[in-house]
């Protein structure tokens, strides 16, 4: 009987083999996952709360069963009784392994919180809000002139040129408000025809939120709807990550676990509601002042948010339940918000090209309509748009999670302590690197790694490492290691060769042969998707290459060009546009006219499905090469590929 069990941690993506009876805190520490534990694991500080996932997790190849961890202890039962918010959670120091597990470490339990970067650079947005405020002085009723309270209010609005209706849910509070304010009201009117909130007359600040629902990260931007000023922003890990690290894993979870779709929906709605509550608290405002929320996300995130099963999107022909712009009130989704807060979701384009891509398109629409422009959001499913001479084509390409550090032997998501930059001297093969959270390079005096070892390598780091290895001739053009260049830096892990990148004793960081293959497959898939669009539009160059998303913002243009992720690209044409989806969502929140702009623009986009394209395989094979390497392909060696589970 094997007493070693696989324990996988989210959101970091770290995996480790723990022994039967080990506490989850011990395993986390061995895996380099930093969980808060001031008492050292003696059950005294009560800070190491974690959540044990359940069901089949195909991404990790793990099936979680409630009996794979020891029973809830008396201490935990008492703490949960005292604070019901702990229900469903466990103390890592009190929970012992009895089988394979997937463990979610919530943000409040992380010693080094996940590095989340989806901040919006300052933008100059046009403002034409859907919400307008009107001051109304209601005339006192008499026996001779005694209209209803609602008629009185509507008449006052009509005098100001507004013909509106009043929402039924406001009627119960209208007369008490009229009496308490002596008939002096400020009224919020949506789309110039519907009263959605009433307040005592005065100066009121009305807010709106733009939300980017990423598969990994949720980003919120809150604006003053009058002047368009950004007043608050926040981001958080998408709590769905505990059900599957990538999109297809979450679809698989829904397919294999009864009620799985409801759990995914509840998780994301709950987190978004929490973020909006925090925003209102931070702004010291009431919920009825947050009246508009615009959301974007990929098709699977869209469907799950609305409680629509994503299963159809897990298999061809990837049929959407709905594509169009969608408006719903908070009460229709049973969200714990002001009932008439309107939640608006951008239109989807088709298949796996979603509302986030549509929003990114809106944010860059001027340049895309004037120049030959490639817009790429690199993620587990790359979304690609190409514009030329007024035509816009779009596709998605299954790059997998390697670019985000997953499926890499020492890979982690972007978290503090993760290697994000790598340089290798071509002559000495000396490695220099930077980690997230420290501005200094590893060979500089003020480098702070004496306090914290590198926890792994994230997506930008693995890209730079592989390019640097290829430039130094340590990887040949086919992607195989050239071990004869520096045999002392190579070792074996089973049947796989690995290169020592950072020597940290038993916590050393390696690049394995299968890691190179994972990046090779990812870059070939993305490159093939771009090539297909170039083929359709008879395009042989780009005026601009726009990298969207938080990951794109961290990529060095030189390394993107050298890795041949994008055909014919040169570093000077590559520009990071940051969280373009968040920028587009913000633009549509603040200017009602932008909504019609993107609704009409999306209808003209031609969607190409790579899965059915006969030339995809041809382009894919061509893109496998590492042209930056000076070493041509060596004698063929069979390379073991890590089994990818979908």
Residue ranges and their predicted role:
Residues 470-537:
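A contiguous, well-structured pocket-lining segment that forms one wall/lid of small-molecule binding clefts
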Residues 211-215, 220-248, 311-325, 359, ...:
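Glycine-rich phosphate-binding loop of actin/hexokinase-like ATP-binding domains
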């Amino acid at each position: 009987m094997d007493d070693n069990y696989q324990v996988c941690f989210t959101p970091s993506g770290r995996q480790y083999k723990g022994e039967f009876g080990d506490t989850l805190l011990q395993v986390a520490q061995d895996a380099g996952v930093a969980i808060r534990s001031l008492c050292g694991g003696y059950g005294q500080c009560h800070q190491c709360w974690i959540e044990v996932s359940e069901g089949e997790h195909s991404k990790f190849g793990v099936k979680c069963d409630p009996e794979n961890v020891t029973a809830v202890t008396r201490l935990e039962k008492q703490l949960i009784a005292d604070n019901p918010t702990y229900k469903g959670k466990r103390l890592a120091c009190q929970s012992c392994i009895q089988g394979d597990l997937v463990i979610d470490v919530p943000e409040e339990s992380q010693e080094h919180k996940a590095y989340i970067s989806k901040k919006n650079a300052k933008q100059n947005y046009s403002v034409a809000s859907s919400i307008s405020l009107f001051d109304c002085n209601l005339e006192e009723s008499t026996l001779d002139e005694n209209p209803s309270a609602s008629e009185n209010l509507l008449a006052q609005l009509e005098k100001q040129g507004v013909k509106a209706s009043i929402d039924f849910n406001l009627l119960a509070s209208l007369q008490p408000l009229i009496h308490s304010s002596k008939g002096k009201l400020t009224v919020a009117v949506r789309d110039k025809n519907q009263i959605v909130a009433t307040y005592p007359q005065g100066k009121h600040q009305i807010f709106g939120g733009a939300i980017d629902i990423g598969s990994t990260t949720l980003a919120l931007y809150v604006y003053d709807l009058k002047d368009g000023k950004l007043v608050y922003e926040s981001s958080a890990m998408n709590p769905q990550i505990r059900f599957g690290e990538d999109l297809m894993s979450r679809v698989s979870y829904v397919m294999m676990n009864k009620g799985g779709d409801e759990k995914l929906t509840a998780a994301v709605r709950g987190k978004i509601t929490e973020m909006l509550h925090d925003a209102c608290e931070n702004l010291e405002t009431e919920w009825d002042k947050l009246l508009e929320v615009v959301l974007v996300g990929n098709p699977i995130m869209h469907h799950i948010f609305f409680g629509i099963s994503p299963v159809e999107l897990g298999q061809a022909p990837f049929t959407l339940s709905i594509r169009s712009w969608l408006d719903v009130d908070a009460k229709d989704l049973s969200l714990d918000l002001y009932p008439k807060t309107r939640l608006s979701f951008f239109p989807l384009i088709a298949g796996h090209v979603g509302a986030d891509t549509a929003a990114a398109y809106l944010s860059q629409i001027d340049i895309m309509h004037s120049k030959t422009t490639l817009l790429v959001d690199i993620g587990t499913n790359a979304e690609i748009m190409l514009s030329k001479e007024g035509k816009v084509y779009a596709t998605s390409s299954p790059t997998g999670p390697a670019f985000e550090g997953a499926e890499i032997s020492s890979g982690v998501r972007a978290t503090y302590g993760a290697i994000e930059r790598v340089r290798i001297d071509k002559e000495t093969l000396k490695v220099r690197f930077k980690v997230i959270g420290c501005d200094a390079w590893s060979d500089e005096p003020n480098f702070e790694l004496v306090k914290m070892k590198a926890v792994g390598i994230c997506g930008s780091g693995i890209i730079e490492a592989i390019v640097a290895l290829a430039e130094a001739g340590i990887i040949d053009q086919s992607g195989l290691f050239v071990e004869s260049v520096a045999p002392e830096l190579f070792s074996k892990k089973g049947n796989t060769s690995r290169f020592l990148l950072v020597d940290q004793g038993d916590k050393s960081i390696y690049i394995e042969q299968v890691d190179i293959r994972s990046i090779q497959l990812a870059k070939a898939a993305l490159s093939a998707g771009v090539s297909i669009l170039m083929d359709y539009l008879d395009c042989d160059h780009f005026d601009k290459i726009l990298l969207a998303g938080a990951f794109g913002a961290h990529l060095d243009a030189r390394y993107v060009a050298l890795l041949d992720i994008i055909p014919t690209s040169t570093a000077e044409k590559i520009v990071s546009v940051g969280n373009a989806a968040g920028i587009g969502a913000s633009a549509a929140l603040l200017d009602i006219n932008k909504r019609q702009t993107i609704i009409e623009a999306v209808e003209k986009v031609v969607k190409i499905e790579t899965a059915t394209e006969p030339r995809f395989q041809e382009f894919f094979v061509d893109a496998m090469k590492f042209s930056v390497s000076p070493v041509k392909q060596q004698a063929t060696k069979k390379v073991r590929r890590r089994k990818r589970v979908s």
